[in-house]
């Protein structure tokens, strides 16, 4: 598929901006300026740049610990990125997120995750919100080859398939999960062909080839927006720096292997050679583009070094939302006595009637009405999209609820039995409890998790959950 001159230029600008910024951050990490880990995207720039060139601010992306490139390609200013890694108040998350937790929802950057897997589920949640709100945009999780051996990958693809979510799963197979070769860690030697097992489109492409990426993402976008068909795209690529700055790099691979990718398969060199071969840009024009970016990154770096740290007095800001600030629980003309089941059913019905952003999801809550009849009749009244029966995958649908809340919906998670929430602890503790804080309040978390347990039936010590930070248990 042909790409126009201006679009090619934009892709190249994104790619070189990522490369220059990452090299600058790598040096800064060596000098101790980066607070925390620093995982660079060097060698993989073609994927983020080409994919994000086809998106707008309403298309949502969810990234990984190696997320600088996706953030920049989506439109994050280098100054905000560098500031965030330096822990400065001028960072995109006001210094609370750091390298692995970058947020700017106004441009569709919904966050990066230091934990492998959750962003896949969150992207499914955003896809669910898109369908709920009848929008025509897409949700895209970027993840590495290591994530495909994680349960979140299976649960995410399955949910996207059965609910026709407009999600494009992009696996950046850079050959190593930290230092473990993909050839060792996976029984299946490819990722793209796994899509067909879930009833979705699957592609295996060269992740360093701008033209192949462009052709595939255009097709996947068409399927997602017009037909609500999810896709899985495996981009085969290679990171040419260590897993994280400061880590030993040549115990599990050789310098010769790395240099082969740096010289012969570098995506930036490939597109530069294409420009020269096709006479799209000459050496002087390419240098001018690079010089402009070099100057911008240098200025951003210096400004970030000089920027202030957050005030100590703000350390606990954004831990909680303002609780019931605009509500009046006493504004009722009459009262009645009900048991917990009846009261839950009445409140769900009342709130769903007045707020179409609310949906309920859980096992057996549809026509069956749930184990304790708390949703009985709501399926017929509000439909399958708002009263959603789920597979048995607590981690999966709680992670989806997290992403749905991040993107504007108000999910109510209904656990068949409350002790089943143990299976979703990772999503509750590492994601739901922390996203609002790490995003400096840019992303809210209007999510309710509820469930019942039979009287006299001891299955778990639920009160231990009271010790979880940022959670309110009723």
Briefly describe each language-model feature range.
Residues 1-47, 54, 235-236, 241-385, ...:
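Conserved acidic/glycine
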Residues 23-27, 33-163, 181-187, 192, ...:
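Cofactor-binding active-site loop characterized by glycine-rich and histidine/acidic residues
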Residues 49, 107-171, 175, 205-223, ...:
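Thiamine diphosphate
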Residues 62-65, 103, 117, 142-143, ...:
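Short beta-strand segments
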Residues 175-180, 200-205, 250-260, 285-286, ...:
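Short beta-alpha connecting loops at secondary-structure transitions
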Residues 340-341, 445-463:
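Cofactor-binding beta-sheet edge motifs in enzyme active sites
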């Amino acid at each position: 598929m042909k790409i126009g001159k201006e679009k090619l230029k934009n892709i190249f600008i994104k790619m070189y901006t990522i490369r220059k910024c990452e090299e600058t951050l790598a040096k800064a990490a060596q000098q101790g300026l980066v607070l925390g880990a620093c995982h660079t995207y060097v060698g993989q720039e073609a994927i983020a740049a080409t994919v994000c060139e086809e998106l707008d601010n309403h298309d949502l992306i969810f990234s990984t610990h190696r997320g600088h490139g996706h953030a920049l390609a989506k439109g994050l200013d280098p100054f905000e990125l560098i500031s965030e890694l330096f822990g400065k108040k001028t960072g995109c998350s006001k210094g609370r997120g750091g390298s692995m937790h970058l947020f700017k929802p106004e441009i569709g950057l919904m966050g990066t995750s230091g934990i492998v897997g959750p962003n896949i589920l969150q992207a499914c949640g955003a896809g669910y919100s898109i369908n709920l709100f009848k929008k025509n945009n897409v949700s895209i999780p970027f993840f590495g080859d290591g994530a495909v051996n994680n349960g979140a990958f299976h649960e995410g693809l399955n949910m996207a398939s059965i609910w026709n979510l407009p999600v494009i799963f992009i696996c950046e197979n850079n050959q190593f999960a930290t230092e473990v070769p993909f050839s060792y860690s996976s029984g299946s030697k490819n990722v793209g062909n796994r899509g067909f097992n879930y009833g979705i489109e699957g592609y295996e492409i060269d992740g360093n080839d701008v033209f192949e990426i462009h052709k595939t993402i255009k097709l996947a976008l068409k399927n997602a927006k017009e037909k609500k068909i999810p896709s899985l795209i495996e981009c085969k690529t290679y990171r040419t720096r260590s897993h994280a700055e400061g880590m030993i790099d040549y115990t599990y691979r050789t310098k010769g292997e790395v240099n082969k990718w740096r010289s012969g398969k570098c995506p930036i060199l490939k597109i530069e050679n294409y420009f020269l071969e096709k006479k799209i840009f000459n050496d002087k024009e390419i240098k001018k583009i690079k010089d402009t970016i070099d100057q911008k990154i240098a200025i951003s770096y210096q400004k970030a070094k000089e920027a202030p740290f957050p005030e100590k007095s703000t350390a606990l800001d954004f831990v909680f939302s303002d609780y019931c600030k605009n509500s009046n629980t006493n504004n009722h003309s009459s009262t009645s006595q009900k048991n917990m089941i009846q009261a839950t059913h009445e409140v769900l019905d009342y709130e769903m009637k007045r707020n179409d952003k609310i949906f309920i999801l859980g096992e057996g809550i549809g026509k069956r009405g749930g184990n304790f009849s708390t949703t009985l009749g709501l399926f017929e009244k509000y439909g399958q999209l708002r009263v959603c029966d789920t597979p048995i995958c607590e981690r999966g649908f709680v992670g989806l609820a997290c992403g749905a809340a991040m993107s504007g919906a108000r999910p109510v998670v209904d656990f068949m039995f409350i002790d089943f929430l143990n299976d979703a602890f990772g999503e509750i503790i590492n994601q739901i409890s922390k996203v609002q804080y790490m995003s400096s309040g840019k992303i809210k978390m209007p999510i309710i998790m509820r469930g019942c347990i039979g009287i006299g039936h001891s299955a778990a010590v639920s009160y231990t959950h009271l010790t979880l930070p940022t959670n309110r248990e009723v």
